[in-house]
């Protein structure tokens, strides 16, 4: 058990230092932190008091405030119980005092029930939770539970909640590793109840790291790619980046790109449409440690159209072409309409802006069969074309002279 504590401590301390190196004050952090405290009868009064003291000291070190980090405490027992909701206390010391005043609830260890309750609290406005901010759960346990923990914990993680677990008992390593967020060496601590102070700074650093604003973001998303951007974290001399991309359903098909330290963006192309991709930006530097950043991006559905070309208003030297516009979220940038004689000859083309789906073609020859092609150009760089045949009518025939009426009753000269 000791190696887990030492490894988690070393890594978390490095990550805690990296947070300060980013240049943003701790007050820039925003997030909702929920402490899940085993308050059941399986925990002795001595152990409960030691854990309560540990959580109080941890809270005192955090940047708690109305516009920063908010904390809440939920007891695990026969039924979950909220000691205080998010936003009730506006400083770390106030949260510490509230934790120290919490009384043990006793009862069964229904952790699964408490986790389902915690999910509602983390996303409920009535509980003081805020939308759009990072969510972190810190669960301190002696390792046992009277009901299943896996399914409700997975639901929390699927919603983006970062889960830290501190086990003070004989918990199952495999089960707790699966319950904590990955990687387990950062999010799971096995430590004796009298040695909890050893991981206080490490856990604080990991919590702040989990609540740091996401800096990697995607833009210009199309059906076949997207562009990534991030702030300058390194220089050309201080390190480099490794950018990783993989379909979320097939991590083995990962693509990697190494970029110089002064890079702040990259465009992925040639991707599958309507697909989730997991992206990781890994800064590599011997000067300072920076955590990797992760993002999931979904490409747009494949473009469709143009469709159903309609030829109308045919004249000997002109005709009108209409078409069903291209559909899909990746709208067409415009259309290229080309017309040329089927039996050979010079073709002409017309550019039609996006938002229009018809044009009149002029300067054609009477009585001629033409091939009309409408091509839609998309932001992704792809093009889709559709063709149809059209014929111009013959030109008007010359009229025959109108017959003159014959004279009657006269002489020929």
From Swiss-Prot:
<dbReference type="GO" id="GO:0005576">
    <property type="term" value="C:extracellular region"/>
</dbReference>
<feature type="glycosylation site" description="N-linked (GlcNAc...) asparagine">
    <location>
        <position position="262"/>
    </location>
</feature>
<dbReference type="GO" id="GO:0005604">
    <property type="term" value="C:basement membrane"/>
</dbReference>
<dbReference type="InterPro" id="IPR003961">
    <property type="entry name" value="FN3_dom"/>
</dbReference>
<feature type="signal peptide">
    <location>
        <begin position="1"/>
        <end position="20"/>
    </location>
</feature>
<keyword id="KW-0084">Basement membrane</keyword>
<dbReference type="GO" id="GO:0062023">
    <property type="term" value="C:collagen-containing extracellular matrix"/>
</dbReference>
<keyword id="KW-0732">Signal</keyword>
<feature type="modified residue" description="Phosphoserine">
    <location>
        <position position="72"/>
    </location>
</feature>
<keyword id="KW-0597">Phosphoprotein</keyword>
<keyword id="KW-0677">Repeat</keyword>
<dbReference type="InterPro" id="IPR013783">
    <property type="entry name" value="Ig-like_fold"/>
</dbReference>
<dbReference type="InterPro" id="IPR020592">
    <property type="entry name" value="Ribosomal_bS16_CS"/>
</dbReference>
<dbReference type="GO" id="GO:0003735">
    <property type="term" value="F:structural constituent of ribosome"/>
</dbReference>
<keyword id="KW-0272">Extracellular matrix</keyword>
<keyword id="KW-1015">Disulfide bond</keyword>
<comment type="function">
    <text>Promotes matrix assembly. Involved in the organization of skeletal muscles and in the formation of neuromuscular junctions.</text>
</comment>
<feature type="domain" description="VWFA">
    <location>
        <begin position="32"/>
        <end position="211"/>
    </location>
</feature>
<dbReference type="GO" id="GO:0006412">
    <property type="term" value="P:translation"/>
</dbReference>
<dbReference type="GO" id="GO:0005840">
    <property type="term" value="C:ribosome"/>
</dbReference>
<comment type="subunit">
    <text>Homodimer or homomultimer; disulfide-linked. Interacts with HSPG2.</text>
</comment>
<feature type="domain" description="Fibronectin type-III 1">
    <location>
        <begin position="212"/>
        <end position="302"/>
    </location>
</feature>
<keyword id="KW-0325">Glycoprotein</keyword>
<keyword id="KW-0964">Secreted</keyword>
<protein>
    <recommendedName>
        <fullName>von Willebrand factor A domain-containing protein 1</fullName>
    </recommendedName>
</protein>
<dbReference type="Pfam" id="PF00092">
    <property type="entry name" value="VWA"/>
</dbReference>
<feature type="region of interest" description="Disordered">
    <location>
        <begin position="385"/>
        <end position="413"/>
    </location>
</feature>
<dbReference type="InterPro" id="IPR050525">
    <property type="entry name" value="ECM_Assembly_Org"/>
</dbReference>
<dbReference type="InterPro" id="IPR036465">
    <property type="entry name" value="vWFA_dom_sf"/>
</dbReference>
<dbReference type="Pfam" id="PF00041">
    <property type="entry name" value="fn3"/>
</dbReference>
<feature type="modified residue" description="Phosphoserine">
    <location>
        <position position="78"/>
    </location>
</feature>
<dbReference type="InterPro" id="IPR036116">
    <property type="entry name" value="FN3_sf"/>
</dbReference>
<dbReference type="InterPro" id="IPR002035">
    <property type="entry name" value="VWF_A"/>
</dbReference>
<feature type="modified residue" description="Phosphoserine">
    <location>
        <position position="91"/>
    </location>
</feature>
<feature type="domain" description="Fibronectin type-III 2">
    <location>
        <begin position="305"/>
        <end position="395"/>
    </location>
</feature>
């Amino acid at each position: 058990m000791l190696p887990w504590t030492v490894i988690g401590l070393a890594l978390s301390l490095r990550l805690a230092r990296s947070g300060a190196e980013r240049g943003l004050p701790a007050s820039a952090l925003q997030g909702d932190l929920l402490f899940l405290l085993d308050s059941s009868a399986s925990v002795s009064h001595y152990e409960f008091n030691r854990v309560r003291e540990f959580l109080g000291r941890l809270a005192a070190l955090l940047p708690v405030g109305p516009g920063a980090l908010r904390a809440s405490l939920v007891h695990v027992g026969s039924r979950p119980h909220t000691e205080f909701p998010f936003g009730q206390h506006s400083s770390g010391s106030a949260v510490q005092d509230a934790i120290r005043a919490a009384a043990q609830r006793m009862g069964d260890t229904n952790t699964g029930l408490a986790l389902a309750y915690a999910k509602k609290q983390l996303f409920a406005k009535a509980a003081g939770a805020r939308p759009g901010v990072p969510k972190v759960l810190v669960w301190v346990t002696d390792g046992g539970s009277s009901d299943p923990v896996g399914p409700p914990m997975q639901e929390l993680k699927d919603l983006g909640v970062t889960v830290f677990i501190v086990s003070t008992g004989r918990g199952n390593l495999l089960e707790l590793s699966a319950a904590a967020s990955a990687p387990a060496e950062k999010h799971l601590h096995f430590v004796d109840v009298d040695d909890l102070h050893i991981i206080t700074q490490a856990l604080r650093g990991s919590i702040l790291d989990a609540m740091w604003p996401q800096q990697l973001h995607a833009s210009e998303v199309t059906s076949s790619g997207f562009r990534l951007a991030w702030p300058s974290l390194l220089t050309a001399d201080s390190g480099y980046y490794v950018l990783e991309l993989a379909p979320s359903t097939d991590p083995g098909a990962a693509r990697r790109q190494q970029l110089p330290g002064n890079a702040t963006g990259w465009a992925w192309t040639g991707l599958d449409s309507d697909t989730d991709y997991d992206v990781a930006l890994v800064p590599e530097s011997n000067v300072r440690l920076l955590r990797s950043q992760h993002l999931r991006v979904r490409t747009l559905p494949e473009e469709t159209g143009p469709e159903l070309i309609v030829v109308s208003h045919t004249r000997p030297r002109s005709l009108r072409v209409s078409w069903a516009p291209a559909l899909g979220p990746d709208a067409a940038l415009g259309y290229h309409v080309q017309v040329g004689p089927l039996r050979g000859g010079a073709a002409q083309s017309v550019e039609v802006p996006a938002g229009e789906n018809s044009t009149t073609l002029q300067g054609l020859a009477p009585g001629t069969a033409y091939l009309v092609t409408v091509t839609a150009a998309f932001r992704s760089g792809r093009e889709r074309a559709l063709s149809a045949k059209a014929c111009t009518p013959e030109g008007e025939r010359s009229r025959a002279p109108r017959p003159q009426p014959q004279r009657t009753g006269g002489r020929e000269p």
